[in-house]
Amino acid sequence: MAHPKRKTGKSRRDKRRTHYKATLPQIALDPTTGEYHLYHRAHWYEGKLYYKGKVITDKTSVGEV
């Protein structure tokens, strides 16, 4: 197994870790329903699955088929 030959200093360690940062998720507002959702994701609203403002699936019609 590999072992470090020298101790990694606090400064070097912290410089490396500066690139790991927490980011807020981007939230979009659906123009059709007015609901907030994540970008590039479908979302449920009143039993219907919406994507880009259009109905993809309706929960009530799935059981009738």
Swiss-Prot record:
Region (Disordered): 1-26
Single GO molecular function: structural constituent of ribosome
GO cellular component: large ribosomal subunit
Keyword Cell membrane carried by entry: no
NCBIfam families reported for this sequence: rpmF_bact (TIGR01031)
Family from the record: Belongs to the bacterial ribosomal protein bL32 family.
Protein name: Large ribosomal subunit protein bL32
Gene giving rise to this polypeptide: rpmF
